[in-house]
Amino acid sequence: MTGTPLRVGLVGYGLAGSVFHAPLIAATPGLALDTVVTSNPERQAQARAEHPDVRVAASADELWARADELDLIVVASPNKTHVPLATAALEAGLPVVVDKPVAGTAAQARTLAELAEKRGLLLSVFQNRRWDNDFLTLRRLIADGELGEVYRFESRFERWRPQLKGGWRESGDPAEIGGLLYDLGSHVVDQALVLFGPVTSVYAEADVRREGAQADDDTFLALTHESGVRSHLYVSATTAQLGPRFRVLGSKAGYVKHGLDPQEAALRDGSRPGASGTEWGAEPEELWGRLGAGESPVTGGGAPVPTLPGDYPAYYAAVARALHADGPNPVTALEAAAALDVLEAARRSAAEKVTVTL
């Protein structure tokens, strides 16, 4: 992409801002990280050290005052700030990327989408797990008909973290929009909708298991899709023995994949997309999933399938193209609203111990 890079203002420099958004923006041709907003002095120093040429501001108000100098706002601050910050950016005439979940409710997400449409501005949601290596591989296998007619999709995002970390993500205050249902659940629900389409019913169990915990830390969702596929989704911080990331069953074959996409770990370790001598998002052969059918107690049947490289950089590359009217919005707010419909139904299902029809 040629021409002057689009100038990006990034709000938030915690995990999402510093580990995911800032490195990916910096690695994207056509984008330039202009300003980082954080009120935390330690994070301000971190931002200056990691991005010496970038301005650091203490308040998002400094971005709105310079709206004519910026081309895109990225909201990577705590969940409860997503809606007010995205609204302020759109009202300032600036396109916006918002980290997931875009809002606490589907109604809020649709209101944001309406505002963006009214202003003629891009509003995109950062659902980076659409570019996980295992998810890209599974999409290809389904598209190629390798599994036949899929009837069951099992997706697990499990961790063993018996000790609480504290912070807003583990708060029991509904205003914080914390808990695993809205954190990791945003990913697994989005992936299920991308693969198998709209949902007609939701059953969920949401438990608080760790001592001192306030927010859900062990959650299960059972979705029935209009297509007939049933999705069983697990998100947990209390799993002492991890299950497969994916187990997908079809009329011809099944696909089982263990382990997590390597990109988050690489970003946390300081690796960057495009660095020489590395193949971004690749994993070793011993981690490949298996495709096929059988009853082997050791392998389950089938044979290893090469995992496609993960590609988080593809998200911001698509955003840059969309801002130049050269491609679609990679993740729309209305898509995110559909996922929030499911998450809200799951929360109600777990609270009332009922199956919720959508």
Model-derived regions: residue spans:
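N-terminal Rossmann-like dinucleotide-binding module
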Residues: 1-51
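Hydrophobic residues in well-ordered beta-strands that form the structural core
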Residues: 17, 58, 75, 98, ...
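C-terminal glycine/acidic-rich active-site capping loop/insertion
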Residues: 28, 252-330, 334
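Beta-loop-alpha module in the N-terminal Rossmann-like domain of NAD(P)-dependent dehydrogenases
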Residues: 54-115
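Contiguous beta-strand/loop segments that form the cofactor/metal-binding neighborhood of enzyme cores
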Residues: 190-273, 313-325
